[in-house]
A protein has these predicted regions:
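Hydrophobic transmembrane alpha-helices of multi-pass solute/ion transporters
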Residues: 1-22, 149
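Helix-loop-helix junctions within the multi-pass membrane cores of secondary transporters/permeases
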Residues: 21-102
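Short helix-terminus and kink motifs of transmembrane alpha helices
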Residues: 4, 40-47, 164, 173
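C-terminal membrane-solvent junction of multi-pass transporters and transport-like membrane proteins
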Residues: 103-131
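Juxtamembrane helix-boundary/capping and inter-helix hinge elements in multi-pass membrane proteins
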Residues: 12, 47-59, 109, 118-121, ...
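Juxtamembrane and boundary regions of transmembrane helices in multi-pass small-molecule transporters
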Residues: 37, 77-94, 98-113, 147-182
Length: 182
């Protein structure tokens, strides 16, 4: 697979272990973004969210923020596989960020943000992301596919919550800023 070929290239580069995998991080980001933006369930939910919010939530803005969240999550998950860092550290830290963001996010968006993590892990994203994790763990020296290859889906579910809450907070901030000028 592509992940295996990129892992072999990284191993032969002679740089710091984590830094040698730059192409794999880019590949992981692109896989995460492209599979999510094409996810049929996300497209449907984004359109319904736009309708239900009387267009306060942009369908495209929601899809892009979820896709960026998945892409960042999968990239960080790929870094975790390469470095061998325990999964729970990232998951606990991520949920602390979610809890803090929830305190400051617009109330209307919180349920949608929490659901966005589940919506993204569907028919398009899961098979490709799972294959990426298993392929990478199989080809990084010292990693076990059984121990290190799984877990990317957890990142793909967690980080969209963070990105959608961030998107809502940015939109809220911009609206408040614009209203102060008027």
């Amino acid at each position: 697979t592509m992940a295996m070929q990129l892992a072999k290239i990284a191993q032969s580069s002679g740089r710091e272990v984590w830094a040698a995998y730059g192409w794999i991080y880019l590949f992981a980001f692109l896989v995460g973004f492209s599979t999510t933006i094409a996810e049929p369930s996300l497209i449907a939910v984004a359109h319904k969210a736009e309708e239900a919010s009387s267009r306060a939530v942009s369908s495209l803005g929601l899809r892009i923020s979820v896709a960026v969240g998945v892409a960042i999550g999968i990239t960080i998950g790929t870094f975790r596989i390469v470095t061998g860092t325990p999964l729970y550290i990232y998951i606990l830290a991520g949920y602390v960020v979610v809890a803090v963001q929830t305190l400051f996010a617009p109330r209307m968006i919180i349920p949608l943000a929490y659901d966005s993590g589940g919506v993204t892990t569907s028919t398009v994203t899961v098979p490709l992301v799972t294959a990426l994790g298993l392929g990478l763990a199989s080809n990084v020296p010292g990693r076990s596919p059984a121990l290190d290859g799984f877990g990317l889906i957890a990142f793909a579910s967690l980080f969209p919550i963070i990105s959608v809450l961030a998107y809502a907070q940015i939109v809220q901030w911009r609206v408040k800023r614009r209203n102060r000028r008027i």
